[in-house]
Amino acid sequence: IGREQLRPYDVQLHDGAVVDARKIEGGFEVTLDGGQEVACRKLILATGMTDVLPESPGLRELWGKSVIHCPYCHGWEFRGRRWAFLVPADTVVETATLLSGWTTKLTLLTNGPSEVSAEHRAWLEGRAVEIVEGRIERLEGDGDELKAIHVEGGRRLDRDVLFVHGRLRQASDLAVRLGCSLVDTGPKAGVVKADPFGATEVEGLYVAGDASESGVPSVASAVAEGAVAAAFACRAIFTEDARRPPGGPVRRG
């Protein structure tokens, strides 16, 4: 559908994976996996992020089904059910507050020695959030459904959903290779530093979607960021062309 909608416009489509990109005079040059090189004046990266999941056996098989990372995406389907959550110690109160919008049956898993502060522990206990310490040995599932979480010491927790806030890493190193900086701390750690319009520290290079600092990780946000980045990249080209002397050469590539 997207290709068909682009047909009336002056757009070139190239099939293939980008294996390299470099800054050249006047823009960028991109190399595809088939060896083809494509030059452009502005470049928008929409390469996304990759989830770095805990190594607990059985978790990966249930990922995106009953092991989830976004309560806004899956919360309604699991409302009122038995939830467990595995998050960094400094975010337990924030996470429990968020998840309580969908259920009051909450269990915090520490997956090892607890690093939860005494203050946060008291807050959780005051709201009937169970805290289970110990390493997760495996997840037991039936098809797409989580049935139980097995914790060291032989303890079995019957739960319906596990919320995991794992780490993210760039799905591609193109941004770093082109000279971009990544956010190094906080909830946005690992994303490319960019302004609200997707512009990075590298002149002419934009980023959109989950890989960018400018939005939130969702399909709707990624689409919106792509539209904004494209508009501002286009505006930058028009601005450059308008500054050229009358009759001077104008690059259209």
Regions found by a protein language model. Give the residues of each.
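A Rossmann-like FAD-binding core segment of flavoenzymes
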Residues: R3-I24, V30-L32, E37-V38, G101-G190, ...
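FAD-binding core/adjacent interface of flavoenzyme oxidoreductases
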Residues: L13-R81, V161, V192-F197
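Short, well-ordered coil/turn residues at beta-beta hairpins
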Residues: C40, A46-G48, L53-E55, L86, ...
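FAD-site-proximal beta/loop scaffold in flavoenzymes
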Residues: E61-E77, L168-V216, R235
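Cofactor-binding loop segments of dinucleotide-utilizing enzymes, especially the Rossmann-like FAD-
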Residues: Y72, P88, N111-P113, D210
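Rossmann-like NAD(P)H-binding beta-loop-alpha module
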Residues: R81-W102
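A conserved FAD-binding loop/helix module that cradles the flavin
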Residues: V93-T95, A208-G253
